[in-house]
Amino acid sequence: MTGKTVTRADLAESVFRKVGLSRTESAELVETVIDEICNAIVRGETVKLSSFATFQVRDKNERIGRNPKTGEEVPISPRRVMTFKASNVLKTRILKSHVARKIKLKPLNPAP
C-alpha cells in the first residue's frame, strides 16, 4: 500500500490536467459533485456510481452493547449509518492490482 491519501485538491488537479478546465473550474466541479452525492445521502437516497460503488443509508435499531472495560451492558441508540459497497468492477481492479504488486515484490532467489 502506498499510504497516499487522495484529497479534493488532488481530484481537482486531475480534472484540470485531464479535462482542460481551469483550476478554479475544476475545483468547483469536484465540490459540486461531492455536494450532490452528500445531499442525496443525507436525504436517504441511494447513490450508485456504475463501475465504482453504491452509497446507501441504513437504519440500525436500538440494541444492547457491552462496555469492553467493565462488561456492563449499555443500550446503543437507534441511528442511521452510511454504507459503502464497492462494485464488482472495482473489486476486480483492486484484486488485479494486489496480485500484480505481489508478483513485482516477490524475491528472485527465495531463501531455503
Swiss-Prot record:
Molecular function via GO: DNA binding; structural constituent of chromatin
Keyword Transcription regulation: yes
UniProt cross-references to Gene3D superfamilies, sorted A to Z: IHF-like DNA-binding proteins (4.10.520.10)
One record GO biological process: DNA recombination
GO cellular component: cytosol
Pfam families assigned: Bac_DNA_binding
Highest taxon, organism lineage: Bacteria
Keywords, comma-separated and alphabetical: DNA recombination, DNA-binding, Transcription, Transcription regulation, Translation regulation
Binding partners and assembly: Heterodimer of an alpha and a beta chain.
Family note: Belongs to the bacterial histone-like protein family.
Functional note: This protein is one of the two subunits of integration host factor, a specific DNA-binding protein that functions in genetic recombination as well as in transcriptional and translational control.
Matches recorded under NCBIfam families: himA, PRK00285.1
Name of the molecule in the record: Integration host factor subunit alpha
Organism name: Rhizobium johnstonii (strain DSM 114642 / LMG 32736 / 3841)
